[in-house]
């Protein structure tokens, strides 16, 4: 009875407005996607604590910042979370989203002779180590019955990969939106493989153990705002694209494509999500990206997911 009463009080507290806090929540973002959604949806109004934003070009440096405690929370994909967790990062996934994984793709120049995944044999593929692009390359090769030794993976950050593809230093680039949409629209590339059928489409907000303990109320409030903004963005791609274009300098038409095709939406962290994440980790083990089998269950914290609107 006492435990039930305590759970009731916690549930009630989660619905109450957060009192003004002196805390600063340090938030990691990629290409300002989360910030763009929050600004466009009005979710950054009347925030009763400070938010300090840190922008990253990819998930790998964001994961490193989480591991170092330089940020409290940040958004990253399923594979980067595994990569960071396997490296010993004291972080937990505290909320989840799912998108249509057509927003992950291996792209090649229009004039390339590469037409499908099988044609990647013997080719050079650029990607960012530990990213969802890295995962896509590994999963696509396995699906096509190719080994990692059948290709040359060149690890680099997105800006360098984009240049390498344009100059012909690599044959293909395994990446994610907005980079996929940007290269399709501005560099005349096409997709030879995407994440449909090989990727869960899951992404997460991950927080440090310290932030979960010391900034619990601020973190819970922030995650509720993110989920509300993501739901709003589903039916307002033009507004989100316009705001994010002003923030990032990326073309609004490209960003509209990103939001329309991803259909990113919040999902609860449940046993099914954890099982999908385990399969992703097991693929990384088979590909020798991580060296020992990883039990992903401890990398999740369900308490915030259960209070999301």
Residue ranges of each PLM-predicted region?
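N-terminal signal peptide c-region/cleavage motif recognized by signal peptidases
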Residues: 17-19
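Extracytoplasmic/secreted envelope proteins and their assembly/folding machinery
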Residues: 35-41, 63, 67, 78-81, ...
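Short, glycine-/small- and polar/acidic-enriched structural segments
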Residues: 23-147, 152-155, 171-174, 191-192, ...
């Amino acid at each position: 009875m006492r435990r039930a009463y305590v759970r009731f009080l916690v549930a009630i507290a989660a619905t109450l407005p957060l009192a003004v806090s002196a805390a600063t929540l340090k938030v990691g973002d990629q290409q300002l996607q989360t910030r763009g959604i929050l600004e466009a949806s009005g979710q950054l109004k009347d925030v009763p604590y400070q938010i300090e934003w840190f922008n990253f070009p990819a998930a790998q440096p964001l994961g490193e910042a989480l591991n170092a405690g330089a940020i409290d929370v940040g958004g990253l994909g399923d594979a980067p979370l595994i990569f960071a967790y396997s490296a010993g990062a004291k972080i937990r996934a505290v909320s989840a989203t799912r998108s249509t994984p057509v927003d992950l793709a291996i792209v090649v120049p229009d004039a390339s002779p590469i037409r499908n995944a099988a044609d990647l044999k013997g080719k050079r593929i650029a990607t960012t180590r530990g990213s969802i692009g890295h995962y896509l390359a590994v999963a696509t090769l396995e699906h096509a019955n190719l080994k990692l030794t059948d290709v040359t993976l060149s690890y680099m950050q997105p800006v360098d990969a984009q240049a390498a593809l344009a100059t012909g230093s690599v044959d293909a680039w395994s990446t994610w939106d907005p980079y996929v949409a940007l290269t399709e629209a501005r560099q005349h590339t096409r997709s030879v493989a995407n994440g449909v059928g090989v990727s869960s489409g899951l992404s997460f907000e991950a927080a440090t153990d310290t932030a979960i303990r010391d900034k619990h109320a601020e973190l819970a409030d922030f995650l509720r705002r993110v989920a509300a903004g993501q739901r709003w963005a589903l039916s307002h791609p033009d507004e989100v694209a316009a705001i994010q274009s002003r923030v990032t300098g990326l073309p609004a038409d490209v960003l509209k494509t990103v939001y329309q095709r991803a259909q990113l939406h919040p999902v609860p962290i449940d046993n099914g999500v954890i099982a999908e994440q385990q399969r992703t980790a097991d693929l990384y083990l088979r590909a020798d990206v991580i060296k020992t089998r990883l039990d992903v269950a401890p990398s999740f914290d369900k308490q915030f997911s259960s209070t999301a609107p």
